[in-house]
């Protein structure tokens, strides 16, 4: 499917306090590389920065319409605080239903220090079935291998920074689906 039709990308980026420092740099590098790929291929890209419950910021990049200043602003954003997976996933679904991202897949970048309640997993699976999107998890576990248990319930694929470089992760994601 990836070779026939390039899908839009919604990238959910964990900016909780536990990702401050090197993990935040890894996450931004992967997110911005996905943005560059989307732009070079004329695809829409949304970056959903998230931390605690209800705390998020969405930057939308349309093909040929985003400036360097907008990209720098996205790169400099860091929300801090706790971690909540429900908020960014709800925002991603809203973008698919109302925001012009009806043909998007989700890249979910996190250190995995959170979990999603079973009711939310069920709602997400229903939305995935209806909207036909995938969620690819990118686990920022460099130096702390593990933690994929929080992503397994809702991600179809999980890549780890402890096992692959940022470029390898992006290459795998692009080849796989996005």
Where would I find each of the regions flagged by the language model?
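Short, small-residue-biased leader/transition segments that mark boundaries at the very start
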Residues: 4-5
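Acidic, Ser/Thr-rich peripheral helices and adjacent loops at domain boundaries
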Residues: 60-75, 155-164
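Short acidic, Gly/Ser-rich segments with clustered Asp/Glu that frequently serve as metal-coordination loops
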Residues: 15-25, 113-116
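Structural motif
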Residues: 8-10, 103-107
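An active-site-proximal "capping" alpha-helix that borders the catalytic cofactor pocket
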Residues: 26-41, 47
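Von Willebrand factor
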Residues: 55-56, 67-104, 114-116, 138-147
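C-terminal helix of von Willebrand factor
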Residues: 84-90, 147-178
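VWA/integrin I-like adhesion module and closely mimicked acidic/polar interface patches used
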Residues: 79, 112-161
